[in-house]
Amino acid sequence: MIGSMGLRIPRATSSLLGRAVNAVATNQSAVAGASIAAQRRWQHYLMPLRDNFEQEGIRNFLSPGSVNMAYTEYQTFILEKLNALVVGTDFEQKDTKSIVLATARDPELAHVFNHASMAHNNHFFFDHLSPVPVKMGDKLFYHINENFGSVDTLRDEMIGTAVSMFGPGFVWLVRTQLPGQPVALRVMATYLAGSPYPGAHWRRQEMDAQTSIGSSPQGLSNGQRFFERSAAGFKGNKLEPTAPGGTDLIPILCLNTWEYAWLREYGTGVGGMGGKLAYAQSWWNMIDWAKVEEEARLETRILTGGDSSV
């Protein structure tokens, strides 16, 4: 029987405490080292977004919870799938864009293409957003007016294309240039995980902003050709290695129309409230136009009369 004296618990000596602290530190270092090693082993891991989007959200556009779902959770899911598909292959140490271009013409690697392209597109979308409104630069403003008539026309075209898409995908603003022709800007849409890059043209799953499938005879023929070559591709036919015409095309902005990006925040849009339209309209106000202009690599124009203009 112990009685009122109770049990005596000896104090830990300083040496014991020191060993314990060192053990904890060693264990933490081992965990951190394992994490770094895992990232090095797996080339494709979640890239942190700038401006603390995950913690603070994107003002007047997406809450932290929506960013977490649309980027942190979804991107992690896609990258885990991609890593499982490419482990032990040459693609393991290639970036997602390189994988997209390398697999787009091989029907047997369609599953690899889809995951790589989706990861690339989703990150591209978030990487061109800003926590505060950014003024459009003069050079980009000039080229948009040259190609679309006005900034408002470009806005309406991108938002209208997004809203009219029946299935999920991405709406892109691209810089394009044919051999011997001046630089042009155009809007294009890709369905599902389709890619805008010329090297992946057979898997663009494209709907041109000028003609949606089914809206005109030309649209019907475009849609028919897409489905025909998709069916042929999955029979094992190899597709030609480069895009016809040698078009130089660079995506400089995109809008994600997949429901995981907007449904949580904006709802279905029933009754005319919220929905994809409200999401697209809010997106336009938070574009990082400085980044768009930088990636567009636009040249200064010289107007008649000797006046220089961007």
Curated annotation (Swiss-Prot):
Compartments where located: Mitochondrion
Primary location recorded for the protein, binned into one broad class: mitochondrion
This protein's record includes keyword Mitochondrion: yes
Keyword Mitochondrion: yes
Pfam families, per database record: Sod_Fe_C
Cellular component aspect of the GO annotation: cytoplasm; mitochondrion
Lineage top rank: taxon: Eukaryota
Keywords: Mitochondrion
Listed InterPro entries: Mn/Fe_SOD_C, Mn/Fe_SOD_N_sf, SOD_C_sf
GO terms of molecular function: metal ion binding; superoxide dismutase activity
Subunit structure: Component of the mitochondrial small ribosomal subunit (mt-SSU). Mature N.crassa 74S mitochondrial ribosomes consist of a small (37S) and a large (54S) subunit. The 37S small subunit contains a 16S ribosomal RNA (16S mt-rRNA) and 32 different proteins. The 54S large subunit contains a 23S rRNA (23S mt-rRNA) and 42 different proteins. mS42 forms a homodimer, in contrast to the mS42-mS43 heterodimer in yeast, building a large protuberance adjacent to the mRNA channel exit in the mt-SSU body.
Family: Belongs to the mitochondrion-specific ribosomal protein mS42 family.
Function (record text): Component of the mitochondrial ribosome (mitoribosome), a dedicated translation machinery responsible for the synthesis of mitochondrial genome-encoded proteins, including at least some of the essential transmembrane subunits of the mitochondrial respiratory chain. The mitoribosomes are attached to the mitochondrial inner membrane and translation products are cotranslationally integrated into the membrane.
Protein's name in the database: Small ribosomal subunit protein mS42
Species of the source: Neurospora crassa (strain ATCC 24698 / 74-OR23-1A / CBS 708.71 / DSM 1257 / FGSC 987)
Gene: rsm26
